[in-house]
Structure formats: structure tokens, C-alpha cells
Amino acid sequence: MDIIMQKRNEVLAQNVIKGLESRNMSGYYAADREAAVKQALELIPEGSSIAMGGCTSAHEIGLIKALEDGNYNYINRAKMSPRESLMAAYDADVFLSSANAITSDGVMVNIDGNSNRVSCIAQGPKKVVFIVGMNKVCSDLDAAMKRARNVAAPANAQRFEVKTPCKTAGKCFDCKSPDTICCQFLITRYSRHKDRIHVILVND
């Protein structure tokens, strides 16, 4: 990554972290993927049960492999029914997620189809750890909503066997398709419980 952009991300991340802290959430900056994995493991005690809500970021940085290789109870939802997976996630010590977008003052936006991910972010698991790339930082809530709907959702639609306008055109049409993956919108602006929500901002 260009050194100038890296410096910009470092400065921006500190502002996001301040915003998160003002909202009773914790923020961290990781200069690369390895640092992000190290920070995540510092937040997850050995022996913890860990669930995940379709977080490709956790796979991409190598966190899931580290958990599977370590002394952790990683809940593999691919081996469970949707209902079993949801109940296990609610009861987990740690829930891993990404965010579709985050504002520069620490407000997160997430869109969900089945709603298992946003429901676990809102309540249930004792701790939620977000892995968020700096490319997801937006100037304000309006920009964050636009990113979630016009960038994140159309990209995520490519991962699933769905028939939605955004999958074929690459942008949001505010559709009501039976296959829509935009059923629930969750805006996380404050955490009722201190030390529950942790956000790792990754310079990647």
C-alpha cells in the first residue's frame, strides 16, 4: 500500500477509534492482516466458544485458521442446521463479524437477509469482535448507508444463489424480491454494555 495512503488511514483510524470510545465501544488499529489476527486473539480467551456471521474478512486475514488451529471452540455453522447455528451463536462467548460500513465517528451499518448476523450483533453473544477494513470508513451515516446498499450488498449477492437486481446490475434498486438479502438494517450507534463490542480497523 502507498505510504501516503497508509499514513492517511492511520490518522483516520484514530478518529474512528475516538468515535467508538465515545459510544461505549472499543477500537483498535491494525497496520496489516497479521497485526489484525494478533489483536483479535488478544480479545478472545483460549477455550472460548466462537461463532461467526458470514464474515469473509475473518477468513481473508487468516483469523479463522488461527482459531481452528488453536485452543478454541470454533462453531462451524456449515455443519449445523440454520436453527442450530443461530442458537449456538446466541450462546457463544464471542461473535465475529464485519461491518458493511462504519462512519468516521464510529457508527456501524449492517444489512442482513436471514437476520442471524444482525440479531447476534444486537444481543446474545457476550462479546462481539468486528474485523473492518479501512475501505469501509465513510464520512457520515448517509454515506455509510449508501455504501452498504450500493457496494456491500451487491457484492455479497454475488456469493449467493439469489435472483436480485443488484446481482445483475451491481447497484441497489431497493427491491422487494423474494431473494433480497436486504431484509434488516442495523445501525449500531452505542453499546449499552461496556467491553461487549470491539472493532479492529485493518489497513488492508
Question: What are the roles of these predicted feature ranges?
Answer:
Residues 3, 25-27, 134:
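Short, flexible active-site loop motifs that bind/organize anionic cofactors or intermediates
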Residues 9-96:
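N-terminal active-site beta-alpha-beta segment that forms phosphate/nucleotide-binding
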Residues 1-9:
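Glycine- and acidic-residue-enriched helix-capping/strand-helix junction motifs
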Residues 90-204:
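Conserved phosphate- and dinucleotide-binding cores of soluble alpha/beta proteins
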